[in-house]
Amino acid sequence: MDPNSPMFQNTPQQPMSLQRSVDDRIDRERTAKKEKDDEKKKQEDEKILQLEKKLEEFQENARFIGDLASNFQTKYQDALNGRIYTLIRGLQDLDRMKGTFSDKNVPLDILPYLDDGKNPLLYSKHCMEKTLEKNKAVNGKIEMYKKFRAHLIKEFSEEMPDFVIEYRKERGQ
């Protein structure tokens, strides 16, 4: 027998090594995807932290300007002008940053909650409660339609039994 014949070419070791290489490749792809996803999440978190920092700076500048304006004295004019300029630069920075958050959607209904100083999580809670109420109402309607259908089939089976038998055959019931 010739060792180069096809009978000797497919040894059990080849499929095992082939399977290992496929498994290794899959593991490498999964690891690379996980690393890529982690890096993307890290970048998103950094963008959000940067936005939070800018918003806090803006809020602090606005508060300080309010204090200066409410107790205005001419000797504080330069400080007030500097803070107004800083506020304008902060708004420009926020305007430049808006492009990095174009894929984020914020519901406009949350703004009254924020204006009232409420926690945004209350908005989420109220949305969930509304959704649960709507789901209960829809589930109630579904149950009513099921009962109506059962009652209708019962009445039809008494009046037109052949029709109901044919209907059930077509529906596979």
UniProtKB/Swiss-Prot annotation:
Keywords: Activator, Nucleus, Transcription, Transcription regulation. One of its GO terms (cellular component) is mediator complex. Residues 1-45 are annotated as: Disordered. InterPro entries: Mediator_Med10 (IPR019145). It is found in: Nucleus. Residues 1-20 have a biased composition (Polar residues). GO terms for molecular function: transcription coregulator activity. The keyword Transcription regulation applies. GO terms for biological process: regulation of transcription by RNA polymerase II. Residues 21-45 have a biased composition (Basic and acidic residues). Its main location: nucleus. Component of the Mediator complex. Component of the Mediator complex, a coactivator involved in the regulated transcription of nearly all RNA polymerase II-dependent genes. Mediator functions as a bridge to convey information from gene-specific regulatory proteins to the basal RNA polymerase II transcription machinery. Mediator is recruited to promoters by direct interactions with regulatory proteins and serves as a scaffold for the assembly of a functional preinitiation complex with RNA polymerase II and the general transcription factors. Belongs to the Mediator complex subunit 10 family. PANTHER family: MEDIATOR OF RNA POLYMERASE II TRANSCRIPTION SUBUNIT 10 (PTHR13345:SF13). This is Mediator of RNA polymerase II transcription subunit 10. It comes from Caenorhabditis briggsae. The gene is mdt-10.
